[in-house]
Amino acid sequence: MNPVINYDELLKKIPYKFAIPIAVAKRAENLKEFAHSYVETWDNNYVSIALKELSEGYIRIKNEEILKVLIPNVK
């Protein structure tokens, strides 16, 4: 079974839509270089593992305070 990670739900937890792919790509690169995975997935796709780790809170975006200025203030 292919578990689907909902990007909109992930944006509710982490409101930085451009930082999420960068964080996932960096984590996938670390996994490719033999880093330890924090979650089990149905496949060995590094991007799927990194997305699941981010959505479950096992990894986080560093320096999140700096990114807060990027959130639009729309009324």
From Swiss-Prot:
Recorded GO CC terms: DNA-directed RNA polymerase complex
Transmembrane segments: none
GO biological process, one term: DNA-templated transcription
One MF term in the entry's GO annotations: DNA-directed RNA polymerase activity
Domain of life the protein comes from: Bacteria
EC number(s) on file: 2.7.7.6
SUPFAM superfamilies, alphabetized: RPB6/omega subunit-like (SSF63562)
Pfam families recorded: RNA_pol_Rpb6
Reactions catalysed according to its record: RNA(n) + a ribonucleoside 5'-triphosphate = RNA(n+1) + diphosphate
Top-level enzyme category: transferase
Subunit record text: The RNAP catalytic core consists of 2 alpha, 1 beta, 1 beta' and 1 omega subunit. When a sigma factor is associated with the core the holoenzyme is formed, which can initiate transcription.
Family named by the database record: Belongs to the RNA polymerase subunit omega family.
Functional note: Promotes RNA polymerase assembly. Latches the N- and C-terminal regions of the beta' subunit thereby facilitating its interaction with the beta and alpha subunits.
Name of the protein: DNA-directed RNA polymerase subunit omega
Species of provenance: Thermosipho melanesiensis (strain DSM 12029 / CIP 104789 / BI429)
